[in-house]
């Protein structure tokens, strides 16, 4: 059995209990997620709520916020979506967001930075379904290709 737990993402998905549809997103599938969410919103006349899940006490923005800003620009079909993304990534570098990542550490390997910032690599949305197993609530995720 493998249990994946991130500090924020999986907890945010489980705690979004009032969501009619649950989509999980990172920069790697932001464009596909925006397209999928827009179709859902149009067909159901629904509202799209973005929930960047990481929270830091000093309230600086992190990659979750950058992803949410980029996703919002894509959802609104703004012409400056690429600039929003570039500005967010520049901000992350300016605040030295990845300064603790090191080449030979398993907790925060330097190689992960490229993966964190990789954008629009996949053409699928990740659709979550809330499930229960005994006393454990979790989100089962399925790829939906566009």
Where do the model's predicted regions map?
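Long, charged alpha-helical interface segments
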Residues: 1, 7, 16, 20-21, ...
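Internal, conserved structured core segments that host functional sites
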Residues: 1-58
